[in-house]
Amino acid sequence: MSLYKKLNVRVECADGFSMSVQARETLYCTPRVNNAPSYSEVEVGFPSAPEELLMDYCEEPQNPTETVYAYVPVQVVTNVIAKHGGMVEGDVPPGVAPLKASRR
């Protein structure tokens, strides 16, 4: 078994917005461990467009689509996913609600 956790597949939302949502011992998350049963804060990275709900956590506000967002509360990530219509693909760490896009 590998000491390193595989990266989650990038989250893509119903409206086309996408972002990386990760948590492991080397990233900006709480707790900073691999394979926690649940995380309270996660690292978001490289969103496809600036997202106001994430800006308080942005490492480089002058370039919001080319940076990471540190210690983002899981409820904020869940709110971003909901705002963009839910997930159509991708993975989120335990603790983030994996809100799926509704089928019509």
Give the role of each language-model region:
Residues 51-104:
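Low-complexity intrinsically disordered segments
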Residues 2-37:
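Amphipathic, interaction-prone secondary-structure segments
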Residues 4, 28, 39, 57, ...:
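Sequence-level detector for tyrosine residue identity
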Residues 11, 21, 44-46, 77, ...:
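Generic structural hydrophobic/aromatic packing signal, biased to beta-strands
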Residues 32-55:
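Short secondary-structure subsegments characteristic of cysteine-rich extracellular domains
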